[in-house]
Amino acid sequence: MSGTHRKVLEVLNGRSLTPPPIWLMRQAGRYLPEYRATRIKAGSFLDLCYTPELAVEVTLQPIRRYGFDAAILFSDILVVPDALNRNVRFEEGQGPRMDPIDEDGIAQLSQTGVIEHLAPVFETVSRLRGELAAEITLLGFCGAPWTVATYMIAGRGTPDQAPARLFAYRHPKAFERLLALLADISADYLVEQIDRGADAVQIFDSWAGVLGEEEFQRYAVEPVRRIIASVRSRRPSAKIIAFAKGAGILLKNYRQATGADAIGLDWSVPLSFAAELQKDGPVQGNLDPVRVVAGGAALEHGIDRILDVLGQGPLIFNLGHGITPDADPEHVAALVSRVRGRR
């Protein structure tokens, strides 16, 4: 993969492009009618993730519709606990559920068979690289150990992930064992995605923002550093984006501490601070997804502010989190058009 003509890769290598490349987190999702039709055909959400033909289709849908500069593998961060036999399921209107894990359960966890369980995901990556135009960057991904662990401890998502925080305070050794195991599995998972054709990968730490300063270093920074070091020890040229949602001022040293090439920013990050972070390397973000729902002047103003402040440096234009199901596909088209119209 030379990747010299793939705009997202160019930015990850430190180049500044005008207009910047654009893709959106959850760009393949429920806001698109074609996605909803494919989702029904799949049966369950996990069946959609594990059926390469359908996962390829939903990955390509937003590329066909909008011509984004990157396609991100359609899967979910919770396929890793699913591969660890945690009985993961997605219940309509309730979000993900799985069997909660305790100290004894953590002691019994094993990496055996995990990568084999994820073979359909790797098949999807291989097929995607064959289907995508040469100029489109293919992104793989995984969940950060802290975020994945929050679901494993509680058995579901919670508003502030208090169950995982409490478990970490009460059982720090068991919790750190869980994070280390997840980091090692995630590194293997990303290496395999890269080997199958992913040009770059992103690590999603969606719940990093609930951690205090000390815990952030221990549970968000260290496991992600471990993943990146492991991937780079085997694939030195790997390009990696790390997204720690809600981390705020703790992002100041996040890139250096983890070794990430680029850092993703949520919409709460002040653009003045984002500009400081951009001096050290590429940034990705950070439009409020609700502006896409709103459309019109609110959408245009949000886009223009980001481009005015960050558009002269290495920027991958994205949202500050995933696009929401109530977004109008026409508003997404307007977003892409406005970003690409910047000169």
UniProtKB/Swiss-Prot annotation:
The keyword Magnesium does not apply. GO terms for cellular component: cytosol. Keywords: Cytoplasm, Decarboxylase, Lyase, Porphyrin biosynthesis. CDD domains: URO-D (cd00717). Its EC number is 4.1.1.37. The keyword Metal-binding does not apply. It catalyses: uroporphyrinogen III + 4 H(+) = coproporphyrinogen III + 4 CO2. It comes from the Bacteria. One of its GO terms (molecular function) is uroporphyrinogen decarboxylase activity. Substrate binds at R26, Q27, A28, G29, R30, D76, Y151, S206, H321. The record marks D76 as: Transition state stabilizer. It is found in: Cytoplasm. InterPro entries: UROD/MetE-like_sf, Uroporphyrinogen_deCO2ase_HemE, Uroporphyrinogen_deCOase. Gene3D superfamilies: 3.20.20.210. PROSITE patterns: UROD_1, UROD_2. GO terms for biological process: protoporphyrinogen IX biosynthetic process from glutamate. Pathway: Porphyrin-containing compound metabolism; protoporphyrin-IX biosynthesis; coproporphyrinogen-III from 5-aminolevulinate: step 4/4. Belongs to the uroporphyrinogen decarboxylase family. Catalyzes the decarboxylation of four acetate groups of uroporphyrinogen-III to yield coproporphyrinogen-III. Homodimer. This is Uroporphyrinogen decarboxylase. It comes from Sinorhizobium medicae (strain WSM419).
